[in-house]
């Protein structure tokens, strides 16, 4: 089973197919043109519908555009489980993140604490995207913000050394 990362942008959509793992392997990369005028979600829908028909991706990880999402990096004391969820939620509220939000753990160390990447997008945008995925049968398993991708890349680069 291959993974596909799709990066939404106003001017185009980037798609990379490959295998996830300790050392990810990219097998194909595509730049999908998008009309630069009109409703962005409708333009993405047209482009992704065609891509989906041609490539039939198994698992899609979607990265939201920078201008449609927000991301915050924060450090909290070392906790796990329910405490981690509660602290991350409080941090997102304190930072004024609006809409729907989630977080991922970038690093965790008992002495240094937990480094979180908190991302959010408006509920309206996420609803439009969810409706679009369902309509074109695109198997999206994960939605992320660009900052999380950068951080994962940096952690992969450290793992190579």
Question: Which stretches of residues belong to each language-model region?
Answer:
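N-terminal phosphate-binding loop and adjacent alpha-helix
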Residues: 26-52
């Amino acid at each position: 089973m291959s993974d596909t990362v799709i990066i939404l942008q106003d001017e185009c959509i980037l798609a990379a197919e490959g295998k996830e793992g300790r050392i990810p392997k990219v097998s194909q990369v595509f730049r999908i043109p998008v009309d630069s005028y009109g409703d962005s979600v409708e333009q993405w829908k047209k482009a992704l519908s065609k891509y989906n028909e041609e490539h039939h991706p198994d698992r899609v990880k979607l990265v939201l555009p920078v201008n449609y999402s927000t991301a915050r990096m924060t450090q909290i004391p070392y906790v796990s489980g329910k405490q981690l969820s509660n602290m991350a939620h409080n941090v997102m509220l304190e930072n004024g993140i609006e809409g729907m939000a989630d977080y991922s753990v970038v690093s965790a160390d008992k002495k240094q604490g937990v480094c979180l990447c908190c991302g959010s997008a408006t509920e309206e945008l996420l609803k439009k995207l969810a409706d679009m995925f369902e309509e074109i049968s695109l198997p999206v398993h994960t939605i992320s913000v660009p900052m999380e991708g950068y951080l994962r890349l940096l952690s992969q680069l450290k793992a190579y050394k």
